[in-house]
Amino acid sequence: MASRAAPVRQTCCCFNIRVATIALAIYHIVMSVLLFIEHVVEVARGKVSCRFFKMPYLRMADLLSSFLLIGVLFIISISLLFGVVKNREKYLIPFLSLQIMDFLLCLLTLLGSYIELPAYLKLARPRPGPSKVPLMTLQLLDFCLSILTLCSSYMEVPTYLNFKSMNHMNYLPSQEGVPHSQFINMMLIFSVAFITVLILKVYMFKCVYTCYKFLKHMNSAMEDSSSKMFLKVALPSYEEALSLPPKTPEGDPAPPPYSEV
């Protein structure tokens, strides 16, 4: 008997959910590698502002916890890719939890930006200094990396790692004495852009959750079909059945023979 459960859709906004989820997993794997490289560069150049300056072991523990966080994010992304490729829905649960937490943090960031944006526009100043790489190239790389981080589920990770170059507020212009009308326009642009990012995160969560339901439905259907398969037994022929001895329960008398009426 076929399952009566409603079939799960294999598309999400005109995209195949498996392809979209695999692309999302690869995207976050690349982001994990970029975060690792960025953090290694920051540590090597001595630009990581550690909270424990006078305690070497605490400073080392802080750095190790940062690398451990990046490693956990990498494992979660690998788990997502492995679960989709191998059709195992339980490996998608860690990434779903990460997406929910990231969405809530992004929502709080959007609400808190209305408080911290005026202070940012007032205090942010360009930092002059010699550099071997052209300044515009560094700004472009920082901008691209900030946008990639903003659109992923790792948005709040740079805040923990103290990445000043990847702060989500960096793409806003930094100047003092902003007129009121210009400030309103900047806040409007910032709000629209951030709400667009939140909608993108909801869409990514929908893709992963739909893929999770699809894999779970497919695996349950396979288990039901395998459990309903009956064993085929070769029955004896009529002559073989007559030649077999009669089977009577032990201790019970045999049934009376048939007699003509």
From Swiss-Prot:
UniProt entry tagged with the keyword Metal-binding: no
Localization, UniProt: Lysosome membrane
Example GO molecular function: enzyme binding
Sorted UniProt keywords: Lysosome, Membrane, Phosphoprotein, Transmembrane, Transmembrane helix, Transport
GO biological process terms on file: cellular response to leukemia inhibitory factor; defense response to tumor cell; Golgi to lysosome transport; induction of programmed cell death; intracellular protein transport; intrinsic apoptotic signaling pathway; negative regulation of activated T cell proliferation; negative regulation of autophagic cell death
Entry's transmembrane regions: 21-41, 65-85, 92-112, 133-153, 183-203
Residue numbers carrying Phosphotyrosine: 258
One GO CC annotation: cytosol
InterPro entries the record matches: LAPTM4/5, LAPTM_4A/5, LAPTM_transporter
Pro residues bias: start-end ranges: 246-261
Induction: By retinoic acid. Likely target of the activated retinoic acid receptor alpha.
Annotated tissue distribution: Preferentially expressed in adult hematopoietic tissues. High levels in lymphoid and myeloid tissues.
Disordered: region residues: 242-261
Bilayer topology: Multi-pass membrane protein
Pfam families, per database record: Mtp (PF03821)
Quaternary structure note: Binds to ubiquitin.
Family indicated by similarity: Belongs to the LAPTM4/LAPTM5 transporter family.
Function: May have a special functional role during embryogenesis and in adult hematopoietic cells.
Name recorded for this polypeptide: Lysosomal-associated transmembrane protein 5
Lineage, broadest ranks: Eukaryota, Metazoa, Chordata, Craniata, Vertebrata
Annotated gene: Laptm5
